[in-house]
Regions:
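NAD(P)+-binding Rossmann beta1-loop-alpha1 motif at the extreme N-terminus of oxidoreductases
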Residues: 1-58, 62-65, 130, 192-193
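NAD(P)-dependent Rossmann-like dehydrogenase/reductase catalytic/cofactor-binding core
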Residues: 2, 206-270
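Rossmann-like NAD(P)(H) cofactor-binding subdomain of soluble oxidoreductases
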Residues: 21, 37, 52, 60-134, ...
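Small-residue helix-packing motif on alpha-helices
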Residues: 36, 63, 79, 197-205, ...
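Conserved short alpha-helix immediately C-terminal to the canonical SAM/SAH-binding motif I
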Residues: 44-45, 78, 187
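Internal alpha-helical scaffold of NAD(P)-dependent oxidoreductase catalytic cores
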Residues: 105-115, 131-169, 181-219
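A short glycine-threonine-serine/GTX helix/turn-capping micro-motif
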Residues: 169-178, 228
Length: 270
């Protein structure tokens, strides 16, 4: 994708997720360091960006004027104020990873001619194992969207979904790393309470999650129930645990947690 701008991708906000994207794009050799420019109002984040040898912008307007695609990675409560600052500088394409910030709302401030891409990555992106859901405005050009899609796909898995599913998808991958960590933590605490060495239990647990995930990935067409049945055989130990989950209606608990997660995403939407 060609551009007349000095930088290919400019970051407004470069905290945990923004920096993970920047580092991932460079690590995967999708972009060179000199093609990235960063602005963050936190000095510590700017120092980190400087240490990474990324370009440094003096403010939001500087990013918009010099980057072909502007990546918005700020807190939802700060988004409108930043968009107002960008209005005069008309970014060619805005990539937003801000939860709940709709394409229509972005274009209502920046103008309907602005190309907009929304992305929802998750934290394993930091190690190139993330998953990202994306959607785009009707006027977004194929070159711009393909460029961003492939960037995220290079850091894990990427899928295009309708914008009206962006809030619901948070309960599928956006928040799910925390679910997984919580489940592991519960099992780990229980193991330690039974006298099992914490380091050994954690190592075994983590590898079990990695291995189980890879099995699912390598057998994408196989029903998940079959994987469960292969472990939870009749009369064995695992089936006792699975039956307990069912008796306590774990599925209902997960559904309720997802409902509240999605509801909060909808509350943040505008």
């Amino acid at each position: 994708m060609r551009t007349t701008k000095k930088y290919m991708l400019g970051f407004i906000g470069c905290g945990h997720t923004g920096m993970a994207i920047a580092r991932g794009a460079v690590a995967k050799e999708y972009l060179e360091r000199y093609q990235l420019v960063v602005y963050d109002h936190h000095d510590t984040n700017m120092k980190t960006a400087k240490g990474e040898r990324f370009g440094l912008a003096k403010d939001e307007a500087d990013v918009a004027e010099n980057a072909h695609i502007v990546l918005l990675a700020v807190n939802p409560t700060q988004a409108d104020a930043v968009l107002e600052k960008l209005k005069e500088h008309q970014p060619e394409c805005l990539l937003s990873i801000v939860t709940g910030l709709s394409i229509a709302h972005i274009q209502s401030i920046l103008g309907k001619d602005t190309q907009v891409i929304r992305a929802m990555p998750n934290t394993p992106l930091q190690i190139g194992e993330g998953s990202t859901a994306l959607c785009k405005s009707e006027n977004c050009k194929a070159d711009e969207y393909d460029f961003i899609f492939q960037m995220f796909a290079g850091m894990g898995v990427a899928r295009t979904i309708p914008e009206d599913q962006m809030n619901a998808i948070v309960a599928v991958h956006g928040s799910v790393p925390a679910y997984v960590y919580y489940f592991i933590e519960c099992i780990l605490k229980d193991a330690v309470s039974r006298g099992i060495d914490e380091e050994a239990a954690r190592a075994l647990l983590v590898q079990t999650v990695i291995g189980s995930g890879n099995l699912l990935k390598q057998n994408a067409g196989k029903p998940i129930e079959e994987f469960i049945n292969e472990v939870a055989s009749k009369g064995g130990t695992t089936i006792e645990a699975i039956n307990t989950f069912k008796e306590l209606n774990l599925a209902s608990i997960i559904h309720e947690a997802d409902e509240k997660c999605v509801k909060r995403a909808e509350e943040l939407s505008h």
